[in-house]
């Protein structure tokens, strides 16, 4: 990052940390509502793409039903934005309380001594899944596509790595898996 980008990054990081200290109900209701309003009504962020995808995915549904799904999508997207803001300030204890995994012991036992891949969709609160490190001794790699905006890319990288998850750019995945594939260091890719 150049000097100006470093200033932008620090402002973004500390702003998110400060906002993240607000009660979660305020964040999700007020800030989430504001983000939803901006994305859905003002900016109309990818609205035509969403409508086209819904029409292709649900041709049997009426226009009104698809619009309801569209509104719910933007509601969900705004919550993901709030989750991202929370990543700058949330405590390890709180993030481990927020995301609960079923059958972790069985998965860990089955994968004992092996590297493994967890394929996850962008459904639910995917930004908070970085807390899987709370449940494993494995080296957790989170594969991501770098953002074009270097300030936001650095923000996401720092936020995702706060609890020990190692963000890995998509193009560097194989190199990092090989590097982490030493005895006793089995990577888990999420």
Where are these regions (language model features)?
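Soluble catalytic domains of membrane acyltransferases
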Residues: 88-190
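Membrane-proximal helical "anchor" segments flanking the first transmembrane region
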Residues: 1-117, 124-125
